Amino acid sequence: MPKGNRSIISLECTVCKERNYTTTKNKRKSQDKLELSKFCPRCRKHQDHKEGKV
């Protein structure tokens, strides 16, 4: 059985550059970089998090 099209990525804070979250994403369905608003424990507030390599 072949592996899926999903790859593991990490989400890093755009302000302090700390990697706080890991998730998976479908490579075929969404080819652009993922950007979400998540809570950053280092900044202690919600910040934008961009996709980075694990």
Curated annotation (Swiss-Prot):
Q: State the Pfam families in the record.
A: Ribosomal_L33
One Gene Ontology CC term in the entry: ribosome
Q: Name one GO molecular function term.
A: structural constituent of ribosome
Keyword tags: Ribonucleoprotein, Ribosomal protein
Judging by the UniProt lineage, the source's domain of life is Bacteria
Gene Ontology biological process terms, A to Z: translation
Q: Which InterPro entries match?
A: Ribosomal_bL33, Ribosomal_bL33_CS, Ribosomal_bL33_sf, Ribosomal_zn-bd
**Family (UniProt):** Belongs to the bacterial ribosomal protein bL33 family.
Write the protein's name.
Large ribosomal subunit protein bL33A
Report the source organism. Answer: Myxococcus xanthus (strain DK1622)
Q: What is the gene name? A: rpmG1
